[in-house]
Amino acid sequence: MLENKLGLTSSAELAREEERISKKKAAMLFENHILDNLESGKFSTLQTIHKYLFDEIYDFAGKLRTVNIAKGNFRFAPLMYIESALKNIDEMPQSNFDEIIEKYVEMNIAHPFREGNGRSTRIWLDHMLKTEIGKVIDWSKVDKEDYLLAMERSPIRDIEIKYVLKNALTDEIDSREVYTKGIDHSYYYEGYTAFKADEL
């Protein structure tokens, strides 16, 4: 299990505390308008999100990972290429839905952090969509299996993830309910279901 600032040695306890603390921080991102003045689609903004969510739990919050990581048979960007990959992602266009999702897929392949990539990157994606096209994703309408399968295939074929996410777009960009339900759903994709964001 990961070393943590909480001194926890049980992975079940760590998972519970990680969910409780970072979900509360995710709600505060919205409540305190922390993202409003950050540049959309930049790695520096993703770093800010990740650090804000996980700083009370992990020393590596907001910092580039120092190990190679994989999920199943898929290896994320090797360490030696990660910095150049992130520079390229920063420069990718983001003027329409397709470009934004292509950028999101590349950031997922980069997987820049040791832990917490999916949860922080989905917030980063919504920030980009909100800023650039005045929409966000209603994640409560995105089926877990459809999403995970589409993301697994996205490095080779991104048409599926575009389809899945386009069908869940909403213009309720300032709705607290859409945001907090979305956080709960985002955490559910990763197996975190002990707490509700609007009750923390």
PLM feature segments, named:
Residues M1-L200:
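FIC/Doc superfamily catalytic core
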